[in-house]
């Protein structure tokens, strides 16, 4: 099976390792390399976010170079804190959100779609502080504080074809992407190896999808679906493959080709999570007890027939309140109820994200719930909020799948972790 070992920086020359320096930018045919603003501008495929790390510069920096790679005996790195400070000096004012960071992005070609184990090593003579590691299409793999010395972390990612935003056809994807964010993000060594194991496929709308991240990055000002934070709550026995997209319904998910990708790659023993409702409710033919219910039934039956395990997720609650009396306005309760009914009918788990998210909004109130949503938005979470919602989903997996008569569901509950602790907006 496929395996590649990389050593970064000035300590090259070791047998069976591919030496990587700060000048090694990703190019077609090379098979690996860093992704910066320079080669992203030069290569069209690097501009399609779903085929890459999903990080890109804020639009007003699109013609500028922000990533200045360096190397030393401990690896390759960039001085994110200094580059952000330079941008602030240039503009004459600090950026909102603190601290903002520039990601160190590395890309590796792999021979086929599937699951890959990534082992990342960082060696630093100074405190690293807060570090975020994302894999694939900006899926959170690690969040924590790292001190001086050597830090090694192992994670799993899924590589799968996708229908990108703005396209009507399926694009093949055979690359592993890693993005490291810190004041001085660094990679010292990296191993990418093919592994077998179950995959959790996600089918949903904008509240689930892998949203892009602008940089200099701040988690409070990025749209983020809970699906891209879900890997933070699984161990390395299971991978997540997210095919959710903004604007999709139980109907358009099939008609626009997204379900075809899942049908092609899912195998017996895998899982498919379905969370819809936000867009179904806008269409007369997809009301809760009509087309919405019928479409979910069809998805359930099709997956059960091929040995894939369906799971329903009730739609995340909006932060919506009535102006006249300041009472909560629940726009999705009927859709959540249908999920619960179908779960009972077919004996499958229903993860009641609607109940958890509604409880959070009710406890916080309109204003205090806002920090976990994208600024000015009452439906879509930012990275903080998506991490919280993914935590609720993980909690539900533990509670609803543990002890299930189908061993595969119980196994999934065993793969759930506690994540990386609280990750809250400042002041929350």
Can you name each region flagged by the protein language model?
Residues 146-147, 207, 247, 317, ...:
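Residue-level detector of flexible, active-site-proximal loop/helix-junction positions
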Residues 257-387, 391-411, 415-418, 422-427:
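Alpha-helical cap/lid subdomain in secreted, periplasmic
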């Amino acid at each position: 099976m496929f395996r590649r070992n990389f050593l970064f920086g000035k300590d090259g020359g070791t047998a069976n390792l591919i030496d990587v320096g700060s000048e090694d930018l990703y190019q077609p045919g090379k098979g690996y390399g860093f992704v910066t603003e320079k080669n992203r501008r030069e290569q069209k495929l690097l501009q399609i976010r779903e085929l890459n790390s999903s990080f890109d510069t804020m639009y007003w920096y699109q013609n500028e170079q922000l990533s200045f790679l360096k190397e030393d005996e401990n690896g390759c790195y960039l001085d994110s804190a200094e580059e952000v400070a330079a941008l602030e000096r240039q503009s004459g004012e600090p950026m909102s959100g603190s601290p903002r960071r520039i990601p160190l992005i590395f890309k590796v070609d792999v021979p086929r779609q599937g699951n890959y184990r990534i082992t990342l090593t960082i060696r630093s003579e100074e405190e690293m502080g807060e570090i975020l590691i994302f894999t694939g299409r900006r899926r959170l793999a690690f969040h924590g504080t790292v001190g001086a010395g050597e830090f090694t972390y192992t994670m799993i990612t899924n590589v799968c074809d996708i229908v990108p935003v703005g396209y009507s056809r399926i694009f093949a994807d055979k690359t592993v992407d890693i993005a490291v964010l810190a004041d001085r993000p660094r990679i010292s060594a990296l191993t990418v190896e093919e592994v077998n194991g179950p995959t959790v496929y996600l089918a949903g709308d904008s509240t689930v999808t892998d949203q892009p991240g602008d940089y200099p990055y701040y988690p409070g000002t990025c749209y983020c679906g809970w699906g891209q934070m879900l890997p933070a709550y699984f161990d390395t026995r299971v991978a997540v493959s997210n095919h959710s997209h903004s604007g999709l319904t139980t109907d358009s998910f099939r008609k626009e080709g997204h379900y075809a990708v899942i049908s092609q790659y899912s195998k017996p023993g895998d899982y498919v999570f379905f969370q819809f409702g936000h867009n179904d409710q806008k269409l007369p033919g997809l009301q809760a007890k009509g087309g919405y219910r019928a479409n979910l039934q069809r998805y359930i039956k099709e997956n059960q027939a091929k040995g894939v395990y369906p799971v329903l997720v009730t739609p995340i609650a909006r932060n919506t309140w009535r102006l006249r009396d300041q009472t909560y306005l629940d726009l999705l309760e009927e859709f959540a109820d249908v999920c619960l009914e179908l779960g009972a009918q077919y004996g499958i788990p229903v993860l009641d994200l609607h109940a958890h998210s509604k409880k959070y909004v009710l406890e916080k109130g309109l204003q205090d719930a806002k920090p976990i949503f994208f600024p000015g938005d009452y439906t879509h979470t930012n990275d903080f909020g998506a991490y919280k919602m993914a935590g609720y989903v993980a909690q539900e997996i533990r509670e609803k799948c543990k002890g299930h008569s189908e061993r595969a569901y119980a196994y999934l509950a065993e793969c759930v972790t506690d994540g990386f602790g609280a990750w809250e907006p400042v002041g929350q």
